[in-house]
Each structure stands twice: as structure tokens, then as C-alpha cells.
Amino acid sequence: MYAGFMRIGVISDTHGLLRAEVLAALQGCEHILHAGDVGDAAILDRLRAIAPVTAIRGNVDLDGACGELPETELIELAGRSLYLLHDRQALDLDPVAAGIAVVVSGHSHHPAMQWHKGVLYFNPGSAGPRRFSTPVSLGFLTITETAIEPRVVDLLPN
């Protein structure tokens, strides 16, 4: 059984831009999840200087090292199963039946968190270039023995 807590940084849709605000916010994380549309593999190297990284590819990650990332990833952190995919609409499994605690996605550029049947569906929004009126954001998951606490942080508040 896992004792204590784990702080996980969650980002998506960097599209080749890794802001200084992102690097500062992720300091102290024990693991970083990138939910696709990385845009430049050097971003993952810079994130790995902070903590271990689990990343998947998004619809813009077609070439080079980013194109070799998996489409989905199932990872266990702090005794909980987390499933990463870029577009939540493409989810083709039953997270409850699979014992998944958190489904992490990106793609929409809109941060969202929703609990359904005991599963957290978490989208940190986009940490890359601002698109239309969407915020520039990232997320955190704090996992304890008894809870999963999600949080989204707006990096460039108006």
C-alpha cells in the first residue's frame, strides 16, 4: 500500500512552446504527464530535468521522436492506475471495468475535471500557445492514500 502523497504535474498541448511559467510551476512534482500535442521532443527532455515523464502523442505529433510516442499509456502512480489519451472522445475502454482511477486527456485546450462512477476525467487545458480565448493552463494531481485531488492552474491570468 502506498503511504504518503504524490504530486503529479499534468500538461497538454504545448505545441512546441514550453513557457518559463510551466517550468516554474512544475518544480517539486514527482512525475509529469504530458497528454499529447508535444510539438517538439526537446520539451520532454526539459521536463525530464524536473521529474520522470510519461507522454503520449497527439494529432500534431506526426514526425520524429514525438511521432514515436504511444497513442495511449496506462501507468500506475502512487498505487493508482492512470490512463492517458489525447482526445477523450477516442476513449475505447471502460475505465471502471479496467480499474482506472484517472483518465487524463488534452486536445480541446479547455481545462476540465469531472468525476463519473468514481473515475476522474481530467484535462489540464493547453500549456502552449494561447488559442482563441482559452486559458493557458496546466494541472496537478495530488494522490494520497484516501483521495485524488485535482487542480487546474491558469498560468497567465488576465
For every predicted segment, state its role:
Residues 150-158:
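Short, solvent-exposed aromatic-acidic interface loops
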Residues 12-16, 37-38, 59-61, 87-89, ...:
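Active-site metal-binding loops of divalent metal-dependent hydrolases
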Residues 1-53, 61-71, 79, 134-137, ...:
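N-terminal active-site segment of His-dependent metallophosphoesterases
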Residues 19-24, 43-46, 72-73, 90-94, ...:
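Short, flexible, glycine/charge-rich loop motifs used to bind or transfer phosphoryl groups or to couple energy/partner
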Residues 54, 81-83, 88-147, 151:
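Conserved beta-sheet core of the metallophosphoesterase superfamily
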